[in-house]
C-alpha cells in the first residue's frame, strides 16, 4: 500500500469497561438518528435544530453526508461498530516501509488530535485545514477529492 489517508479521525481508544459504558449510554440516544434520520428525544432533536441554525451549512452538510434514515441498520450492528472502534488497539509509531500516511487535520478539532496522529504514526503527512471535524468532506467534497487525487498522483 503506497498511501493511507485519514480524514480528521479522532482515533479514540479506551478500556473495555469504558467502551461498554459509553456504548450503552450513548447508543440508545444516537441510534434513532441513524435509523430514522432524527433523534427520538425531543431535547436532542431541538439541540440539533438549534446547532444547525447556529452553525448553518456545516451541520446541514454533515447531516446530509451522514444521510437520511437507514431503517436497515440494526442497533446491534451500530453497537458492534461503536464498541469495537473504541477498544481496537492502535499501536504507537506505526511505520510501514513504502507507505505514506496522510491525515486531513481539522484544526478546529483541537491540538490533542495532532498529538494523537503524531503518537500513532511515525511520519504522518499532516494536511492542516482551518475547519471542523469532517467539514472538508461534508462541505467541500470537490476540494477533498482534489487533495486525495494530488496525494495519489505523487508517485505516478
Language-model segments: what does each one mean?
Residues 4-5, 102-104, 127:
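Hydrophobic/aromatic beta-strand patches that form the interior of the parallel beta-sheet core
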Residues 2-34:
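Flexible "cap/lid" loop of the alpha/beta hydrolase fold
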Residues 34-94:
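Conserved alpha/beta-hydrolase catalytic His-Asp/Glu region
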Residues 128-145:
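Catalytic histidine-centered segment of alpha/beta-hydrolase-like enzymes
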Amino acid at each position: 500500500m503506497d498511501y493511507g489517508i485519514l480524514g480528521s479521525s479522532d482515533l479514540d481508544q479506551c478500556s473495555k469497561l469504558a467502551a461498554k459504558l459509553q456504548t450503552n449510554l450513548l447508543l440508545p440516544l444516537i441510534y434513532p438518528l441513524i435509523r430514522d434520520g432524527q433523534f427520538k428525544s425531543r431535547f436532542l432533536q431541538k439541540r440539533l435544530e438549534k446547532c444547525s441554525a447556529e452553525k448553518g451549512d456545516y451541520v446541514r452538510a454533515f447531516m446530509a453526508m451522514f444521510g437520511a434514515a437507514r431503517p436497515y441498520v440494526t442497533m446491534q450492528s451500530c453497537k458492534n461498530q461503536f464498541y469495537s472502534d473504541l477498544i481496537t488497539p492502535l499501536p504507537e509509531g506505526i511505520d510501514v516501509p513504502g507507505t505514506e500516511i496522510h491525515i486531513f487535520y481539522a484544526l478546529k478539532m483541537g491540538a490533542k488530535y495532532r498529538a494523537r496522529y503524531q503518537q500513532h504514526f511515525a511520519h504522518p503527512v499532516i494536511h492542516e485545514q482551518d475547519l471542523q471535524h469532517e467539514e472538508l468532506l461534508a462541505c467541500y467534497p470537490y476540494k477533498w477529492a482534489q487533495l486525495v487525487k494530488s496525494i495519489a498522483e505523487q508517485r505516478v
